[in-house]
Amino acid sequence: MSTEPELHRNDSSPSRNPEDRRKRRRPEDYVEAISQHSTRAKEHFLHPGTHYRPLAQFLKGSLHKSLRIRTVSQPRPHIFAALHNLDCSFDDPNRVRFFDSKEGLDDFASYPLPRKNCGQLLFLRGYPSPKWVQLIGAKYRVDAEFFRRHLSIGQISEPFDISVLPSASQNIVKLSITSLGKQNVTLSKQGEGVDSLKDFHESLGDDPNVVGDSIVRRYSVHDKTRFSIEQDVTMCVLKTGESWIAIILLDCGRDLDEGPAGPWIESSSRPHMHGFDNVFNPVLLFEPNICLKSFEKKEGTSSSNGTQLLQKRCFQQSCSLLHTKSYGRFLSPAVMNTDAFYALSDVFNFAACAESQFLGLLKSKFMSETHLHNKEEHMKECLLDLKDHKLLLHEHIQGIQAVISIINDRGGSRWPRAGSASDAARMVSMTPSARRSSKESMLQVVVERPAITEQEMLPARSGAEAEAEAMAQRLLKDYEALRSDAQALSDLYSEGMRDIRDNAMLAESRKAIEQARGVGHLTLLAYFFLPLSFTSTLFGMNFKELGDDVSIWAC
């Protein structure tokens, strides 16, 4: 009798000993658990773990990385982790704690878990080190699949081992943020940028002393002066007893001029970077009465906000500020503390605004180049450009549709939601200042909310539920509008491609007509030339001399 089921049960069954559970929370035990699962081959296990081998090697530091030239020799100090305590008010100095990429590891290890009935947001910025992943994974018992998917670049994964099934992504939410850049693009072909990006991926993590390099998933050239990069935000929500924590992995970490070389910066221009203006356009966020509110809620100085503004940073991106104290400034603290999706709504809103600007760039580019579709010398170039951008749009439409599904599910079925816990328990768990801020915020919700019908009152919702639902509906409308705009733009690109093909066929028809006319002229010339040529040839032949009294007809 085979012993495989018994071995599998012994390996996977959780221990009931509390001491074993505490040991399993150690970083080394977290790595060992992943490493053991990665050794399970398909020949012996129904659930093989061979696709976790690269992650296990990464956590052990055994992935082979060749040290390459970096854009700067001494990177700036970097805030890698930012922890938001949602039970504190925005003015409370304990609301946000920042942890440096080097010295902050030990401080983070000793930082307590969220209090009862309280939530936390943990932002991790850039490419992590194995030690940070080990510590966070062990402390919060994070599913290894969460890290594996986010690190699915370079040597960490194969392109076919990321499942697209919704059931495989119940607590893994991924958003894409597009940043628009302006610079003199010297790459002659898009393929050169792809090769350079591949080298960039292979260089990530090559220096163990540098943590938090920005990750770029896609680099696209739109014309000679404009390009875009795509970066991911991967999120999950974990419950720790009666509290919860949301982990947000941001691709945006250090400025791109501090990390490995990439196609967005040429080797010849690196020494002169301080002479450039800002390379990336800002992401413009909309908030009603923002000009008035910004005076009432000052966002603090650079040091208190977790940023470094000591010198001009040409490659700074707007998403590099998502982790700061400014996050959630216009949200209700009480609802953030009880509803995980609402607490993460600013991330969804930021991604939507970035996507809107990206679609606006593509639309303006299409409109400004429409006149080139009729010029024969530009047809081939325009057709290839439209084809590439249509494929890019198709992937963006798929991403937008995925986000719409996430919003409809409110992130996940197990995410904490407003109304699941009593308001009294929530208010008791919050600090006094946060409690006052919560009452003012909820009062504002009640005052600003229009009259509701009886249908809307069934079932009756608390103020927190109403606020969370209103935010979800707002995001849903925004993303549905983005999907509609992207689809309309894709149709424009398809129409443009058809116009170019029609114009090309018309040009070929004109050429054929001109060639036919030329052939007609040649035929007319041949009509007269051939008999004349035959006659001249005939009389030019050598004949035997005839007598004077014999005619040629007699011959």
Where are the regions that the model predicts?
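Hydrophobic alpha-helical segments
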Residues: 148, 157, 504, 540, ...
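Extended N-terminal soluble domains of membrane/secretory-pathway proteins
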Residues: 2-378, 385-392
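Alpha-helical transmembrane anchor segments
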Residues: 525-555
